């Protein structure tokens, strides 16, 4: 036995991975298992070219010594030797060598070898789809170590993902990380052969110089590694990481002249790891091995860095900005809305800048002044000179001391106006004085419309031809960009400012490089997206708080620094919380130290240690203000931790721990953050005596004492009123303030305040139970505070004190101080004299509780007792008060917007409280409404007051009341429900004044009228009113008499609004209305009747479309009246009709429905529907109709809403087919854009929902001449109802199966059918709402949603609906069916074609087969699905006459049935499963017909579901025994065994007949016994049964 055979016996080959044969060698790679069971990889190689190699050596070498040297070199260069040598190094990441065996030929060359390596079970890099960036960086570092070891030895030549193997492991946090190992050294070569030009490697990873045969150096491995890393970066799972490394990977793929070597790459990675102190915390080096790799590389590089004679040329990724060149240390991108660059100033370029400043101070001063004016518009002319001088000094100082200057550039890009304004608000907050001393404040903000730069625009330092080519490309791009016309003024201004700066630099230096730099700089400003560019200069030696800073510090130093850091965070967080800007807090109080920076002290304030270094305790702290992209800007703070320290820094100080724990406990109660911070400050001051010894904390204690003094005064005044237990004791449920109900879109409970007198003041406490959105609690408090800051009027508005959550229950208390006049009214009487009237929400009149009903009754009685004049006077008084209050409210908003520039301006959203004093004088007060009311309810507030005064008579007494209500709907639908629409609504207080004044010209008082200055002659104005201010999308313009609406770019006066149909049961809790608008065009004065229809609820701007088109009429009669034109988008449709006086009495289908909108079967509705169907069918497109409407993808031009002019001239109905379908069947087809597809099943399908409606009302239709006239049209013939006359019921299942006569030709020619009910669509209303549109043109599709049963697979409604259950005597286990229905949702994912009604599917598939019932058609009536089957004139075997049956006929019956069942099984793959005498029909000529396929199944369906296979369907006494006993089942797999249950059922039928008719045939008895063996394996199959019958 040879050595190789002995060696191979040690391993058992499991799998051959690869086999390679060529002229040079034969390779066999396999997975094997050693004797211990451990997997490994065997690689066996046979070298076939040794003789040729030896000949080459002899030609190239002159002596034997040289030949032997070449032989040794060739043997040493073999793969297993490289692997053996490098894998023994612990620091390398190379596949691990285990052992090998080799043999040599007679020349001394290795001719065969087998070597063994470790097996890596997780595959290679090519197999992973996602990878974290920290794993990519760790891979990079490990490959750099490998390449450093290879540097003077070998070139790998085939680095690629397929040759880097993986091993996954879990770190301490339980997260999966990757270890990588480089393998496959078969292509490796020693540097001895570097001048060779062998083309070896994988195409996409081969360096260009190899392909061009320019020789091999170790730079080709750098290229391959760069390509590998770039391919992996595309699979990165994160979106926040330092993208500067991506640029480095690109540089690694440069041409070899500019490609960095391994030493340069190592130096770059070590340097950039050190520079992390200037960046936000990223996870690039968080892999457990990354720091180890960096430390090793630093040690390897020491000698190279100290080499002064041949210094290492460093890699710099440079960026030019505003005339300076910077080293870019980091690029972080958060999605596409935010880029962040960490820049370090070039020292060489700084000297140039110093010269520029010294020689050209005037130019620089002007430029600096311009920049300051851009960033601060509040500078006045008197201060400009001083500012210029200061700027000069500052700039000169900075330029003299800016070596190593670090600049953080934050680019916030947004394409959305709202997002952009929020970002500007964020900038304004960070510029505010409250954060001046706490954050890096001396930043610059550039506002423009062009992203300043992108990662792909970073210019890397290059040399030679590449640099010249890059300059040419930049100049070319600049020339192209100059030709682009820039429309945006902000962008023009930005470009002019930058050009001025660049031109000055060009004039001073006269340097071509500077010209090119300016061109590059300008080329970055050519985009239409808005952006904010924030430049944050950080002082020299500023650094982030992290572990290494404190590793050598003593305990006292660590304690002082941690206290200063958390005090700094607490002070900043408290100041930010006062502004109500919650989104900033979560980045201040919990950022793992990413935003907290040490700042070096001023030279005069420094204290040095013994070694001359500045003491850490003298460093201050500054926040890098947390600019985040807009997805986080809007969100409130949701952090429950005060954790500003990185996890690597342990917290030991007890005060810091107490602060963190207290914040965690209190923040979970969702009380306002300002309150939490105030209490934390009190905790800090409690320990002040202990920490006074640290002078470094004096500043913070001074600030905290100032804050706490105000807070303690507030606590003394309120005596802890907001504590939940104290509130509970004070509340008296009998003492309440009722709040006037408001116009809102959803039913809510009545609002009220508990009145609490306390400490010489009176408070109102608002209580909320079961807060639905607990995270909104703290955010809501800030909204209230901002609202009250805008109002600033405690005489009319409740003053918010504080809020509290009871930890032990879901109760929230909001405490307000009552206005003084309201409080004095309470204190002056022994009982509450705030006699508010309270009316129920008018949406919910039928669902009120008893208290609400009593309030309504009292209110209505009081109103009836008063005269109309008294009510009128009271209404006038309150409306005047409210108008003046609203004017003041709007003025306050204008003032606040100008002075404060808040992030969000709150709209009107107030509780209305009406009081009456002892002098019978009513007054209005207001409290901010937290829930239940949309912000646009200023219109509805006037309606509320009228509703309070007049009660339910309001809309009858005041004709403008309905208009007010509907105007509020119109505004609300524009604003709250769908913000993305093409139309706009305009109104003003003067408009509301005019509306109410139509009822009474003396309604308003003079001072109000004079203050409004209404323009009565503005009806013909040509332009929109000048905007005074804007709240979201509602425009409050100049005073005008009429409200206005802008539709499709045309402005109309709103003369009147009527309410149309309402989708009351909308699944989102909303009511999608049709509003009837009477409009007057401003320019032409034409009047229109416009139907505004809300269709969808899409808020995505991309789905918004505008389409204004004139309808092409296909029928031109006077029945269906189409609009003149339609303006529509994806959400709203406007149908415009030329206004006529006859339109005053337009009605909807609701006017003709019976029993309070529950019956839509009236003859007028039936006629309208038939007219519409005729109209719909006549409006299909024709290919030759000349239409070029590319926007209309439907095949039908008909509209969903039309006017129907009834022939009797008694009514004009607007018919919305979607609304009618919704009312009839609960299917909201407006939720889908597939209008034609839906209508094909609703209308054009036969049968369909419409045919169901027609068939249900057939008696009314057949007795109405107008309906018959409509149905006589050739398009409508198929909709004519079927005339059915029931002859008799099949007794065993009452009302389910009947014999009927059907008029099939329409001429009273009747044909007999068997009609069977197989399901129902009663549940369609619920199903349609929950699951969307349903195709009803195919009955099989109904089964997925509606038709589930167990015994006969009937509809759910058979078991859930009592009436239907009583109607059909199903003889099934009711409880069992209910349990079956509970699993209803499981069926939604099943294949529709194989589901119920299965009987219909089966009968359709066997149509034409002899011996089975034949289906004719199906139809819908009264929501029941019926099938019609050909009538079989015979008897069933249960009722068959005794004269017909004998032994001969029994053999005939058995023979026919066995063949029918065999054909069903073999040809159609169907099993009947319910064989019994009732289901077998026979004629006098002994012809057999098999019926009732209600529980039949397709074979595939049965054999894929064992539970279904052995289900207990069918009839007891005829079921196979293996259904009930598993012991009797066959031993084989049900998928492969024949189905024998029908054989057993047939045996039971024959047994019944043989017993009933006294059969004496022994052969028949013997055969039937074989059919009836209880054990499945013993029973004969259908095939065997037929063979036995053929032998008889």
Curated annotation (Swiss-Prot):
Q: What are the alphabetically sorted keywords of the record?
A: ATP-binding, Coiled coil, Kinase, Nucleotide-binding, Repeat, Serine/threonine-protein kinase, Transferase
* UniProt-annotated binding residues for ATP: 2-10, 43, 1348-1356, 1376
Bias category Low complexity: which stretches? 349-402, 499-526, 837-864
Q: What is its EC number?
A: 2.7.11.1
What does the record give as the active site? 158 (proton acceptor), 1474 (proton acceptor)
- Domain Protein kinase stretches: 1-302, 1342-1592
Provide the GO MF annotations for this entry: ATP binding; protein serine kinase activity; protein serine/threonine kinase activity
EC class of this enzyme? transferase
Q: Which Pfam families does the protein's record reference?
A: Pkinase
Return the Basic and acidic residues bias intervals.
486-496
As recorded in UniProt, coiled-coil segments are 461-518
Q: Which reactions appear under catalytic activity for this entry?
A: L-seryl-[protein] + ATP = O-phospho-L-seryl-[protein] + ADP + H(+); L-threonyl-[protein] + ATP = O-phospho-L-threonyl-[protein] + ADP + H(+)
The record's listing under InterPro entries reads: Kinase-like_dom_sf (IPR011009), Prot_kinase_dom (IPR000719), Ser/Thr_kinase_AS (IPR008271)
Q: Where is this region: Disordered?
A: 348-402, 455-526, 837-867
Family (UniProt): Belongs to the protein kinase superfamily. Ser/Thr protein kinase family.
UniProt name for this protein: Probable serine/threonine-protein kinase DDB_G0293958
Origin species, per record, is: Dictyostelium discoideum (Social amoeba)
């Amino acid at each position: 036995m040879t050595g190789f055979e002995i060696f191979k016996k040690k391993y058992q080959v499991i799998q051959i991975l690869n086999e390679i044969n060529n002229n040079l060698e034969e390779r066999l790679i396999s997975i094997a298992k050693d004797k211990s069971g451990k997997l490994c990889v065997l690689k066996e190689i046979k070298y076939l070219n040794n003789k040729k190699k030896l000949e080459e050596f002899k030609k190239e070498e002159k002596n034997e010594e040289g030949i032997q040297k070449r032989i040794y070199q060739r043997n040493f260069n073999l793969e297993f030797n490289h692997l053996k040598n490098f894998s023994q190094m612990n620091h390398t990441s190379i596949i691990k060598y285990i052992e090998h065996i080799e043999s040599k030929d007679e020349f001394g060359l290795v001719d065969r070898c087998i070597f063994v390596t470790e097996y890596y079970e997780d595959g290679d890099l090519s197999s992973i789809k996602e990878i974290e960036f920290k794993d990519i960086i760790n891979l990079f570092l490990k490959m750099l170590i490998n390449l450093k070891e290879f540097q003077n030895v070998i070139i790998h030549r085939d680095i690629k993902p397929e040759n880097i193997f993986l091993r996954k492991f879990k770190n301490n946090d339980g997260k999966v990380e990757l270890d990588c190992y480089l393998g496959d050294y078969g292509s490796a070569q020693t540097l001895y052969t570097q001048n060779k030009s062998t083309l070896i490697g994988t195409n996409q990873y081969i360096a260009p110089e190899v392909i061009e045969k320019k020789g091999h150096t170790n730079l080709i491995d750098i290229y391959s590694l760069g390509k590998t890393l770039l391919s992996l970066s595309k699979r990165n799972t994160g979106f926040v990481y330092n993208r500067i490394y991506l640029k480095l990977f690109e540089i690694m793929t440069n041409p070899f002249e500019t490609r960095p070597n391994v030493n340069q790459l190592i130096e770059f990675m070590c340097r950039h790891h050190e520079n992390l102190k200037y960046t936000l915390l990223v996870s690039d080096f968080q892999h457990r091995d990354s720091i180890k790799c960096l430390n090793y590389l630093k040690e390897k590089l020491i000698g190279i860095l100290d080499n002064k004679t041949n210094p290492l040329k460093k890699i710099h990724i440079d960026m030019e900005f505003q005339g300076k060149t910077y080293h870019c240390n980091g690029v972080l991108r958060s999605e596409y809305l935010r880029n962040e660059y960490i820049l370090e100033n070039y020292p060489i370029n700084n000297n140039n800048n110093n010269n520029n400043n010294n020689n050209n101070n005037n130019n620089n001063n002007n430029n600096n002044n311009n920049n300051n004016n851009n960033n601060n518009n509040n500078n006045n002319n008197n201060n400009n000179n001083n500012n210029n001088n200061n700027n000069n000094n500052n700039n000169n100082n900075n330029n003299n001391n800016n070596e190593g200057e670090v600049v953080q550039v934050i680019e916030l890009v947004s394409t959305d106006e709202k997002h952009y304004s929020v970002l500007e608000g964020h900038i304004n907050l960070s510029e505010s004085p409250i954060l001046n001393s706490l954050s890096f404040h001396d930043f610059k903000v550039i506002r423009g419309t062009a992203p300043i730069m992108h990662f792909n625009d970073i210019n890397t330092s290059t040399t030679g031809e590449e640099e010249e080519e890059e300059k040419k490309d930049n100049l070319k791009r600049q020339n192209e960009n100059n030709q682009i016309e820039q429309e945006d003024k902000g962008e023009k201004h930005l470009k002019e400012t930058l050009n001025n700066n660049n031109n000055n630099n060009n004039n001073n230096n006269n340097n071509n490089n500077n010209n090119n730099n300016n061109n590059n700089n300008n080329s970055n400003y050519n985009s239409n997206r808005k952006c904010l560019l924030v430049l944050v200069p950080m002082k020299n030696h500023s650094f982030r708080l992290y572990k290494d800073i404190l590793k050598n510090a003593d305990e006292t130093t660590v304690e002082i620094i941690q206290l200063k850091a958390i005090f700094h965070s607490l002070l900043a967080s408290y100041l930010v919380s006062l502004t109500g800007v919650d989104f900033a807090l979560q980045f201040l109080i919990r950022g793992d130290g990413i935003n907290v920076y040490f700042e070096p002290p001023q030279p005069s304030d420094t204290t040095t240690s013994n070694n001359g270094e500045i003491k850490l305790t003298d460093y201050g702290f500054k926040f890098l203000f947390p600019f985040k992209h807009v997805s986080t800007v809007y969100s409130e703070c949701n952090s429950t931790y005060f954790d500003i320290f990185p996890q690597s820094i342990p917290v030991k100080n007890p005060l810091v721990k107490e602060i963190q724990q207290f914040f965690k406990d209190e923040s979970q109660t969702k009380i306002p953050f300002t309150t939490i911070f105030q209490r934390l400050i009190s905790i800090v001051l409690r320990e002040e005596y202990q920490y006074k010894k640290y002078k470094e904390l004096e500043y913070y204690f001074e600030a905290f004492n100032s804050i706490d003094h105000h807070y303690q005064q507030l606590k003394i005044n309120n005596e802890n009123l907001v504590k939940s237990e104290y509130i509970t004791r004070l509340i008296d449920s009998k003492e309440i303030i009722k709040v006037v109900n408001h116009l809102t879109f959803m039913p809510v409970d009545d609002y009220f305040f508990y009145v609490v007198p306390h400490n010489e003041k009176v408070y109102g406490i608002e209580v909320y139970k079961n807060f639905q959105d607990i995270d909104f609690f703290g955010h809501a408090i800030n909204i209230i505070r901002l609202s009250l800051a805008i109002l600033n009027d405690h005489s009319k508005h409740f003053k918010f004190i504080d809020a509290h959550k009871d930890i032990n229950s879901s109760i929230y208390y909001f405490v307000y101080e009552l206005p003084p006049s309201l409080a004095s009214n309470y204190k002056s009487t022994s009982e509450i004299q705030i006699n508010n009237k309270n009316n129920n929400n008018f949406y919910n009149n039928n669902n009120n509780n008893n208290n609400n009903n009593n309030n309504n009754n009292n209110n209505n009685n009081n109103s009836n007792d008063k005269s109309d004049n008294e009510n009128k006077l009271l209404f006038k008084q309150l409306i005047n008060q409210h108008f003046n209050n609203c004017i003041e409210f709007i003025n306050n908003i204008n003032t606040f917007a100008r002075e404060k520039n808040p992030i969000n301006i709150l709209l009107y959203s107030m509780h209305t409280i009406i009081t009456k004093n002892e002098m019978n004088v009513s007054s209005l007060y207001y409290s901010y409404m937290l829930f239940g009311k949309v912000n646009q309810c200023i219109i509805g507030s006037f309606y509320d007051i009228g509703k309070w005064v007049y009660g339910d008579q309001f809309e009858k007494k005041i004709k403008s009341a309905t208009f007010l209500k509907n105007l509020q709907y119109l505004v609300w639908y524009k604003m709250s429900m769908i913000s993305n629409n093409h139309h706009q609504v305009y109104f003003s207080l003067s408009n509301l004044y005019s509306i109410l004044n139509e009822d009474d010209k003396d309604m308003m008082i003079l001072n109000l009228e004079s203050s409004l200055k209404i323009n009565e002659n503005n009806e013909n104005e040509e332009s929109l009113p000048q905007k005074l201010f804007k709240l979201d999308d509602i425009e409050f313009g100049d005073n005008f008499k009429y409200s206005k609406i802008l539709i499709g770019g045309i402005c109309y006066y709103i003369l009147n609004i009527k309410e149309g149909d309402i989708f009351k049961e909308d699944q989102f809790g909303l009511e999608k209305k049709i509003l009837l608008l009477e409009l007057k065009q401003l320019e032409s004065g034409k009047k229109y009747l416009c139907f505004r229809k809300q269709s969808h609820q899409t808020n995505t701007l991309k789905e918004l479309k505008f389409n204004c088109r004139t309808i092409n009429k296909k029928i031109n009669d006077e029945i269906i009246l189409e609009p003149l034109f339609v303006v529509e988008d994806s959400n709203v449709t406007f149908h415009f009709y030329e206004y006529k006086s006859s339109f005053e009495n337009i009605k909807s289908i609701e006017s003709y429905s019976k029993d309070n909108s529950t019956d839509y079967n009236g003859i007028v509705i039936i006629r309208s529907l038939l007219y519409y169907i005729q109209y719909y069918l006549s409006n299909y497109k024709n290919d030759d109709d000349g239409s070029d409407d590319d926007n209309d993808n439907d095949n039908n031009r008909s509209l969903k809403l039309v006017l129907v002019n009834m022939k009797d001239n008694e009514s004009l109905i607007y018919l919305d087919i979607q609304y009618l379908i919704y009312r009839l069947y609960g299917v909201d087809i407006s939720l889908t854009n597939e209008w034609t597809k839906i209508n094909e099943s609703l209308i054009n399908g036969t049968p369909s929902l419409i045919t169901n409606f027609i068939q249900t009302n057939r008696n009314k239709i057949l007795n109405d001449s107008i309906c018959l006239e409509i149905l006589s049209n050739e398009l409508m013939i198929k909709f004519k109802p079927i005339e059915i006359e029931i002859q008799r019921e099949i007794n065993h299942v009452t009302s389910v199966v009947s014999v009927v006569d059907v008029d099939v030709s329409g001429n009273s020619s009747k044909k007999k059918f068997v009609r069977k009910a197989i399901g129902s669509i009663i549940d369609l209303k619920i199903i349609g709402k929950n699951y969307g549109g349903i195709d009803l043109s195919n009955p099989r599709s109904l089964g997925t949603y509606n038709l589930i049963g167990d015994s006969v697979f009937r509809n759910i409604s058979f078991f859930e609906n009592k009436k239907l259950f009583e109607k059909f005597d199903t003889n099934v286990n009711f409880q069992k069916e209910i349990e079956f229905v509970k699993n209803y949702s499981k069926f939604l994912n099943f294949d529709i074609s194989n589901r119920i009604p299965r009987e219909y599917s089966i009968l359709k598939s066997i149509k034409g087969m002899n011996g089975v019932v034949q289906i004719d058609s199906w139809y819908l009536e009264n929501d029941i699905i019926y099938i019609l089957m050909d009538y079989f004139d015979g008897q069933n075997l249960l009722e068959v006459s005794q004269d017909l049956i004998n032994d001969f006929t029994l053999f005939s019956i058995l023979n026919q049935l066995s063949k029918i069942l065999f054909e069903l099984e073999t040809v159609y793959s169907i099993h009947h499963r319910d064989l019994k005498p009732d289901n077998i029909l026979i004629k006098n000529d002994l012809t057999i017909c098999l019926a009732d396929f209600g529980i039949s199944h397709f074979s595939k369906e049965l054999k894929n579901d064992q539970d279904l296979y052995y289900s207990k369907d069918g009839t007891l006494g005829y079921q196979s025994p293996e259904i009930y006993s598993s012991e009797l089942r066959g031993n084989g797999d049900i998928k492969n065994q024949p189905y024998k249950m029908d054989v057993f059922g047939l045996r039971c039928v024959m047994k019944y007949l043989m017993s009933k008719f006294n059969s004496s045939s022994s052969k028949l008895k013997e055969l039937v016994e074989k059919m009836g063996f209880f054990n499945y394996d013993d029973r004969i199959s259908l095939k065997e049964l037929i063979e036995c019958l053929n032998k008889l």
